[in-house]
Amino acid sequence: YRQRQGCRDMELRDCYAEFGGDYKEVLGRLEREQTVQKFVLKFLDDKSFSSLETALQNRNYEEALRFVHTLEGICRNLSFTRLYESSSRMTEAFKAGDFENAAAGMPQLSDDYHQIIRAVEAYKTCREG
């Protein structure tokens, strides 16, 4: 993001545009930009993704379902549209007992997740200074 625009110009809506989220929707849900910002920044510390990776590596599909479902809920609440969609597909596959198809969704989910992390970290860096 920094290459395309000046860091000081980066707003939370720009961050959402960067990773394919719905800023207008989340602002309608949470009502204040400060509230949205608080929860978006807290997402950087959420362990659902790393726990999901570990559960998949250990072939613990019950735990994987729990973590991907948690991630799906967070993404729905924060209007992280792309990551919500990929986590929702994985959740449904796990619930259907289709573990192979669920695990096959991990590369897309990982890409979507890391795109959010990069954008939010850039936003955080810009805000700090």
What are these regions (language model features)?
Residues 1-66, 70-129:
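Two-component system phosphorelay core
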